[in-house]
Amino acid sequence: MLNTTSMAMPRELTTTQKAARGVLFQCLQKMEIGCLTVIESFKTETTERSERFSTPNGDYNSEPVAATIEVKHPGFYSRLLQGGSIAAGEAYMDGWWDSPDLTALMKLMALNLRALDKLEEQGSWLTKLLYKFSHWSNRNSEENSRKNIHAHYDLGNNLYEAFLDTNMLYSSALYNNADDSLEQAQINKMDRLCQQLELKPTDHVVEIGTGWGAMAIYMAEQYGCQVTTTTISEEQHAYAEQKIKERGLENRITLLKEDYRNLTGTYDKLVSIEMIEAVGKQFLPSYIKVCESLLKSGGLMAIQAITIADQRYDYYSNNVDFIQKYIFPGGFLPSVTSLTQATTKYSDLVTRDLFDIGLDYAKTLNEWHLRFNRAESEVRSFGYDDRFVRMWRYYLSYCEGGFLARTISAVHMTFQRP
């Protein structure tokens, strides 16, 4: 049973707002882990109302889990009830609520998804239907893929330069040592994938998802490989093209602007870093078939993928979240089991290695968030407004909290074509 304590009564809410608050608080009483304090500060009086929801099991992995949310707008409760977790993100973007530690709050919520699922069930069926239709309309057909990639990766290279490492890697790093810098951890990540591929100078590697060119350049310079790499992002293509020329690697690296479905030829090795999330559930079979077709017999394939917990996969597959609506339109996280089952069903690829780097991703996101905050004035100078800045803070904390709670993770998976 949860204990709730109340201070002074708030300004009178409307009947609808009171009812919505009551539903939310009932759901919060079903929390199983941690402690949440809800503070209402939207009233004109000097007094505040505070509700504290605490569970007998306040720890996670022997560490206390506690967070605070400050509600700044009386319409927050009904908005949340109507639109669920997506509306929570939208309300944050609009400044309707805040938290002194947003990541701690996201972690606490991720640890109590069963309680929050009950809240989602209370939402408007029409709103849910509209979310699903919007997500379906963004499915990653060849035409839509370009639009979806453009929506996130073509925001401007200067935005990403403000918070990424010097090599511009927008994917999880690998912290071999606790004191590794972000730059070193990103090199660790690239080198581990190269080791998994058993790269040698005679290899011709195909990379699906160039990013800003760091992995292709690393493989060419450090392992002497021939690399063919593709991206459908205009901004990334232009940036990678310039970097390849600056390094004098035009004879080693072939840079394409092709959808993965249009790639031809056969290669010794294949690498793809956090591109599979942009494939979509519907197109996962074709992605796997294409990857297999690009590999020579005996060829190795290494991917880095963000994954949803197996236990959440069915629920996630049938719903739409904040990231899919605002950050990565058309995005979809596979689970480890769904990936292995799909490769078994749609190819002859054999799984050779599985390596989890979920907590490394949490640390990577934390570093990105710190850098993003330090660069806030620079980001605003690019023309991004307060709502955009808050959206990105929410996105970074939302993801870090999920990785810390293990509801999402990231893996290196290595496959081989017989």
Where in the sequence are the language-model features?
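Feature captures hydrophobic
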Residues: 1-186, 192
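Conserved class I S-adenosyl-L-methionine
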Residues: 201-209
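Conserved SAM-binding loop of SAM-dependent methyltransferases across substrates and taxa
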Residues: 212-223
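Conserved SAM-binding loop
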Residues: 240-241
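A short acidic, Gly/Pro-enriched loop at the edge of an enzyme's catalytic core
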Residues: 261-270
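A short glycine-rich, Lys/Arg-flanked "PGG" loop and its adjoining helix->strand segment in the class I
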Residues: 285-297
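Conserved beta-strand signature within the Rossmann-like core of class I S-adenosyl-L-methionine
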Residues: 298-306
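Substrate-binding/catalytic lobe of Class I Rossmann-like enzymes that use SAM or dcSAM, i.e.
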Residues: 307-418
